[in-house]
Design a protein with these regions (language model features):
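Class I SAM-dependent methyltransferase SAM/SAH-binding core
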Residues: 43, 49-87
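Structural signature of beta-strand start/N-cap positions in the alpha/beta core
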Residues: 41, 64, 94-96
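Short catalytic micro-motifs in class I SAM-dependent methyltransferases
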Residues: 102-103
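N-terminal, positively charged/glycine-rich alpha-helical extensions of SAM-dependent methyltransferases
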Residues: 1-10
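Alpha/beta-hydrolase-fold catalytic nucleophile elbow
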Residues: 128
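Conserved alpha-helix/loop element of class I SAM-dependent methyltransferases that forms part
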Residues: 19-38
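A conserved beta-strand element that flanks and buttresses the S-adenosyl-L-methionine
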Residues: 99
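A short glycine-rich, Lys/Arg-flanked "PGG" loop and its adjoining helix->strand segment in the class I
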Residues: 111-125
Length: 128
Protein backbone atom coordinates (compact mmCIF):
# COMPACT_ATOMS: atom_id res chain seq x y z
CA UNK A 1 0.00 0.00 0.00
CA UNK A 2 1.46 3.34 -1.01
CA UNK A 3 1.50 6.48 1.07
CA UNK A 4 -0.81 9.22 -0.26
CA UNK A 5 1.02 12.15 -1.86
CA UNK A 6 -0.38 14.66 0.66
CA UNK A 7 1.15 12.68 3.54
CA UNK A 8 4.52 12.55 1.77
CA UNK A 9 4.41 16.31 1.35
CA UNK A 10 3.49 16.76 5.00
CA UNK A 11 6.27 14.42 6.13
CA UNK A 12 8.82 16.24 3.95
CA UNK A 13 7.69 19.62 5.30
CA UNK A 14 7.92 18.47 8.92
CA UNK A 15 11.29 16.82 8.33
CA UNK A 16 12.63 19.94 6.64
CA UNK A 17 11.34 22.34 9.26
CA UNK A 18 12.22 20.37 12.36
CA UNK A 19 14.90 17.77 11.81
CA UNK A 20 16.96 19.03 8.87
CA UNK A 21 16.97 22.66 10.03
CA UNK A 22 18.16 21.62 13.51
CA UNK A 23 20.94 19.57 11.93
CA UNK A 24 22.04 22.51 9.76
CA UNK A 25 22.12 24.82 12.78
CA UNK A 26 24.07 22.31 14.87
CA UNK A 27 26.64 21.76 12.12
CA UNK A 28 27.06 25.51 11.63
CA UNK A 29 27.61 25.97 15.38
CA UNK A 30 30.34 23.33 15.39
CA UNK A 31 32.02 24.56 12.22
CA UNK A 32 32.06 28.14 13.51
CA UNK A 33 34.26 26.91 16.36
CA UNK A 34 36.37 24.49 14.30
CA UNK A 35 37.37 26.91 11.53
CA UNK A 36 40.47 28.89 12.57
CA UNK A 37 39.81 32.48 13.63
CA UNK A 38 42.19 33.87 10.99
CA UNK A 39 40.43 32.12 8.08
CA UNK A 40 38.52 34.26 5.59
CA UNK A 41 38.21 32.34 2.31
CA UNK A 42 36.58 28.94 2.85
CA UNK A 43 35.68 26.17 0.42
CA UNK A 44 32.71 23.96 1.27
CA UNK A 45 33.56 20.75 -0.60
CA UNK A 46 30.37 18.84 -1.37
CA UNK A 47 28.20 21.74 -0.26
CA UNK A 48 24.84 20.60 -1.62
CA UNK A 49 22.64 23.68 -1.74
CA UNK A 50 24.88 25.60 0.67
CA UNK A 51 22.52 25.75 3.65
CA UNK A 52 25.21 24.78 6.16
CA UNK A 53 27.64 27.34 4.71
CA UNK A 54 24.97 30.05 4.78
CA UNK A 55 24.17 29.30 8.43
CA UNK A 56 27.90 29.31 9.19
CA UNK A 57 28.27 32.78 7.64
CA UNK A 58 25.52 34.03 9.97
CA UNK A 59 27.75 33.00 12.87
CA UNK A 60 31.04 34.08 11.29
CA UNK A 61 30.21 37.05 9.02
CA UNK A 62 33.87 37.58 8.11
CA UNK A 63 33.91 34.29 6.19
CA UNK A 64 33.59 34.24 2.41
CA UNK A 65 32.43 30.74 1.51
CA UNK A 66 32.32 29.20 -1.94
CA UNK A 67 31.07 25.71 -2.66
CA UNK A 68 31.71 22.85 -5.04
CA UNK A 69 29.53 19.84 -5.66
CA UNK A 70 29.19 17.11 -8.26
CA UNK A 71 25.55 18.13 -8.62
CA UNK A 72 24.89 21.87 -8.74
CA UNK A 73 21.34 22.53 -7.60
CA UNK A 74 19.18 25.09 -9.43
CA UNK A 75 18.95 27.22 -6.27
CA UNK A 76 21.80 27.58 -3.79
CA UNK A 77 22.50 29.68 -0.71
CA UNK A 78 26.13 30.33 -1.71
CA UNK A 79 28.05 30.44 -5.02
CA UNK A 80 28.55 26.81 -6.15
CA UNK A 81 30.80 25.52 -8.94
CA UNK A 82 30.57 22.13 -10.60
CA UNK A 83 33.19 19.64 -9.42
CA UNK A 84 34.04 16.39 -11.18
CA UNK A 85 34.69 14.58 -7.91
CA UNK A 86 38.38 14.27 -8.69
CA UNK A 87 40.15 17.60 -9.30
CA UNK A 88 39.14 20.82 -7.59
CA UNK A 89 39.06 23.76 -10.05
CA UNK A 90 41.27 26.03 -7.90
CA UNK A 91 44.95 26.87 -7.57
CA UNK A 92 47.13 25.47 -4.80
CA UNK A 93 46.49 27.11 -1.39
CA UNK A 94 43.63 29.20 -2.82
CA UNK A 95 41.51 28.92 0.35
CA UNK A 96 42.37 29.53 3.98
CA UNK A 97 40.29 26.52 5.00
CA UNK A 98 38.30 23.71 3.38
CA UNK A 99 35.30 22.05 5.01
CA UNK A 100 34.09 18.55 4.15
CA UNK A 101 30.80 17.68 5.83
CA UNK A 102 29.22 14.24 5.31
CA UNK A 103 30.86 13.79 1.91
CA UNK A 104 33.65 11.21 2.04
CA UNK A 105 31.36 8.19 2.33
CA UNK A 106 29.76 9.23 -0.99
CA UNK A 107 33.06 9.22 -2.90
CA UNK A 108 34.78 6.45 -4.83
CA UNK A 109 38.24 7.72 -3.88
CA UNK A 110 38.19 9.45 -0.48
CA UNK A 111 41.99 9.66 -0.36
CA UNK A 112 42.00 11.62 -3.60
CA UNK A 113 39.30 13.99 -2.32
CA UNK A 114 41.33 14.59 0.84
CA UNK A 115 44.52 15.17 -1.17
CA UNK A 116 42.73 17.75 -3.32
CA UNK A 117 41.31 19.47 -0.25
CA UNK A 118 44.80 19.66 1.26
CA UNK A 119 46.18 21.03 -2.02
CA UNK A 120 43.76 23.98 -2.22
CA UNK A 121 43.88 24.74 1.53
CA UNK A 122 46.55 27.13 2.76
CA UNK A 123 45.60 26.13 6.29
CA UNK A 124 43.12 23.70 7.79
CA UNK A 125 40.86 21.04 6.33
CA UNK A 126 37.89 20.51 8.65
CA UNK A 127 36.17 17.14 8.22
CA UNK A 128 32.91 15.92 9.69
Amino acid sequence: MSVPSWSKRLLNAVHGALIFRRRVESLADRLAIAIPSDAIRVLDLGCGDGQVAWALMQRRPELVIEGVDVLVRPETQIPVMAYDGATLPFADQYFDCVTIVDVLHHTDEPARVLAEAARVAAGSVVIK
